[in-house]
Amino acid sequence: MSRHFRTHTTSRLTFPSSSGGLAITRLPFSSTSSKLLLQQLSSTSPAAAATAVTITTSSPARNLQRARASAAEQGMEEHGKAAVGWAARDDSGVLSPYNFSRRAQKDDDVTIKVLYCGICHTDLHIVKNDWGNAMYPVVPGHEIVGVVTGVGAGVTKFKAGDTVGVGYFVASCRGCECCGNGYENYCAKMVTTCNGVDHDHGGGAATQGGFSDAIVVNEHYVLRVPAGLPLDSAAPLLCAGVTVYSPMVIHGLNAPGKHVGVVGLGGLGHVAVKFAKAFGMRVTVISTSPGKRQEALEHLGADEFLVSRDAGQMAAAAATMDGILNTVSAWHPIAPLFSLMKPMAQMVFVGGPTRPLELPAYAIVPGGKGITGNCVGGIRDCQAMLDFAGEHGITAEVEVIKMDYVNTAMERLEKNDVRYRFVIDVAGSSLAGSGDAKI
């Protein structure tokens, strides 16, 4: 069994207007992380509203919504490719075998045999309808590594036999300012790899993810996986990798010799440490858990380890960091962390706590310090991240499972009982539901 890490959902911070002249600014993180917000931007358009399905309770309206979604899928299936995956059919989140059809391959499409697919915490939110936008039946999975089995007549980037990846989204408008600048991940018409609605390519059908044997994707959203990267532990890079790589590049936290703090040592945090060290940076892991010191320093190669609850350690590290990447998805006090940053430094949030965080204005105003967020990354950044990972041998820490184990894996993921990411050996699994559960 290969061992390796889990990602968390990412989130952007927003600042509501203050009232009464108070110096406290509330940063309202809700269960709708930035991934959900991006999904909602597309699903609430007039066209998307006609096919979007929000399922919370059993009712005639719910059955009608299901029927409409099913009809849209059947329209796609008439000339599509037969596929089998594991889908959730209600908010229990339980996954089971599901036969469906991929869309027919178009001139600019790539057909991919799925080899491995990572499990992200977002998948758990989707199958349990935590965000109220699940379109059942839903096949999760957006950390896909596979091999090209077919290409359309107009495809120029790939050929049969190429090893490729697919990340968090499979379509965008390609005409807006965000798309033009390489930030398709912030396009208002971005279509997620699973539980999205694809009007341009999929005929308005719900997208189904990588917990399946095959997928058909427009070549613009397909990524080349460098030779030499282990395919199982490369899969989480399609989400966790770009989620930390992209903001590090955008905010200049990739310069050799600079000092970056990484808050949290989980699925995102451990990958952030690996990328930062490969950039040549000085890396300090910041955690509430002293027991993670050995893991951070000896296994991952961090330069320093800081216990955030230790006032002495915090004081000694004051004003030393050029920036902080905050990967924590649970509530935590953030005001003390700003004391670690140099003037004008940025704290980038890539985790999405569900409880509101409080930030006193004095923590950022005197030093001109900034706070921002990041959600995955565009195609350009994702390909650059994979190429960089290939050059430096960066992978995620994973626990490889077979599809039969996926429901147990979801239960463990909900309890944070994984070190640090689950990856499904899709090609090595019996998708009909038999075979060994774990490898």
Swiss-Prot record:
Keyword Nucleotide-binding: no
Record-listed Zn(2+) 2 binding positions: C173, C176, C179, C187
Binding locations of NADP(+): 122, 243, 264-269, 287-292, 327, 351, 374-376
Pathway named in the protein's UniProt entry: Aromatic compound metabolism; phenylpropanoid biosynthesis
GO biological processes: lignin biosynthetic process
Top EC class of this enzyme: oxidoreductase
Alphabetized Pfam families for the sequence: ADH_N, ADH_zinc_N
GO MF term (any one): cinnamyl-alcohol dehydrogenase activity
UniProtKB keywords: Lignin biosynthesis, Metal-binding, NADP, Oxidoreductase, Zinc
EC numbers, comma separated: 1.1.1.195
Sequence positions that bind Zn(2+) 1: C120, H142, E143, C239
UniProt xrefs under InterPro entries: ADH-like_C (IPR013149), ADH-like_N (IPR013154), ADH_Zn_CS (IPR002328), CAD-like (IPR047109), GroES-like_sf (IPR011032), NAD(P)-bd_dom_sf (IPR036291), PKS_ER (IPR020843)
Signal peptide: none
Catalytic reactions of this protein: (E)-cinnamyl alcohol + NADP(+) = (E)-cinnamaldehyde + NADPH + H(+); (E)-coniferol + NADP(+) = (E)-coniferaldehyde + NADPH + H(+); (E)-sinapyl alcohol + NADP(+) = (E)-sinapaldehyde + NADPH + H(+); (E)-4-coumaroyl alcohol + NADP(+) = (E)-4-coumaraldehyde + NADPH + H(+)
Alphabetized PROSITE patterns for the sequence: ADH_ZINC (PS00059)
Cofactor(s) the protein requires to work: Zn(2+)
Cofactor note: Binds 2 Zn(2+) ions per subunit.
SUPFAM superfamilies: GroES-like (SSF50129), NAD(P)-binding Rossmann-fold domains (SSF51735)
Quaternary organization: Homodimer.
Family, per entry: Belongs to the zinc-containing alcohol dehydrogenase family.
Role description: Involved in lignin biosynthesis. Catalyzes the final step specific for the production of lignin monomers. Catalyzes the NADPH-dependent reduction of coniferaldehyde, 5-hydroxyconiferaldehyde, sinapaldehyde, 4-coumaraldehyde and caffeyl aldehyde to their respective alcohols.
Name of the protein this chain belongs to: Probable cinnamyl alcohol dehydrogenase 8C
Native source organism of the sequence: Oryza sativa subsp. japonica (Rice)
